C-alpha cells in the first residue's frame, strides 16, 4: 500500500489580491427592447417605448497565485453592475423601470509577457430583475448559468487596464477594467 502526495509550496511573494472597477456594456439590442414593448402591448397597453443607455459600473475582487514565471491562476467575485431599462406606456399611461443586477464568481488562467496579459476561464453568474411601476415593484430571478469569459490588457506597477468579455447564455457582456493587484 503506497500513499502518494503532491504538494505545491506557495510562497508569499507568489500570491496576490486584486480589485478594481469595471465599466460594462450589456449588449442589449433594439430587438431585445422591441420584445419587451411587444409583450407589454399584448397585455393591453396602446403603446410602449423602451430605452436604455446599455451601460453600467461594477467591480471585481479576488486572489491570484503565480504558478510559473508568466502563468497564474485567479479566482474572484464580480459585480456586473445595474442595467436600467425605462419604459413609457400609454392606454393607460404608465412609466415602468426595470433594473437588472448580476453577480458572479470567476476562475481563470492568466498568461503575462512584458506587461501584456491574456486570460481565460469560466464565470458562474446570477441575474435578477426589479420592475418598478406606479402600483409597486416586484423582484424576480432572471437566470443563472456558467459560461466562458476572457480578457486582454496591459499591467505595470500593480495596475492593470484591460478589456473583458463575458458570455451569458446566448448573449454577452463586455467591460473595460481598471484594477490593482497587491502581492503579499
Q: PLM ranges: what are they?
A:
Residues 31-49, 87-95, 129-142:
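Solvent-exposed loop segments that connect transmembrane elements
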Residues 1-3, 21, 37:
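Generic N-terminal initiation segments characterized by hydrophobic and/or small/turn-forming residues
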Residues 13-16, 20-30, 59-131, 159-161, ...:
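Gram-negative (and chloroplast) outer-membrane scaffold detector with strong preference
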Residues 1-15:
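Cleavable N-terminal export/targeting peptides
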Amino acid at each position: 500500500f503506497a500513499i502518494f502526495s503532491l504538494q505545491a509550496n506557495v510562497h508569499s511573494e507568489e500570491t496576490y489580491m486584486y480589485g478594481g472597477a469595471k465599466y460594462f456594456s450589456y449588449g442589449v439590442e433594439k430587438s431585445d427592447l422591441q420584445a419587451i414593448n411587444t409583450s407589454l402591448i399584448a397585455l393591453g397597453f396602446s403603446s410602449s417605448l423602451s430605452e436604455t443607455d446599455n451601460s453600467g459600473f461594477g467591480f471585481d475582487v479576488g486572489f491570484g497565485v503565480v504558478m510559473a514565471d508568466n502563468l497564474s491562476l485567479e479566482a474572484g467575485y464580480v459585480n456586473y453592475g445595474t442595467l436600467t431599462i425605462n419604459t413609457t406606456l400609454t392606454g393607460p399611461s404608465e412609466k415602468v423601470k426595470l433594473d437588472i443586477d448580476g453577480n458572479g464568481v470567476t476562475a481563470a488562467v492568466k498568461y503575462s509577457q512584458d506587461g501584456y496579459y491574456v486570460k481565460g476561464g469560466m464565470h458562474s453568474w446570477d441575474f435578477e430583475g426589479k420592475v418598478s411601476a406606479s402600483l409597486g415593484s416586484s423582484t424576480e430571478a432572471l437566470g443563472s448559468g456558467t459560461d466562458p469569459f476572457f480578457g486582454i490588457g496591459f499591467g505595470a506597477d500593480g495596475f492593470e487596464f484591460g478589456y473583458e468579455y463575458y458570455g451569458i447564455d446566448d448573449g454577452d457582456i463586455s467591460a473595460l477594467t481598471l484594477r490593482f493587484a497587491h502581492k503579499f
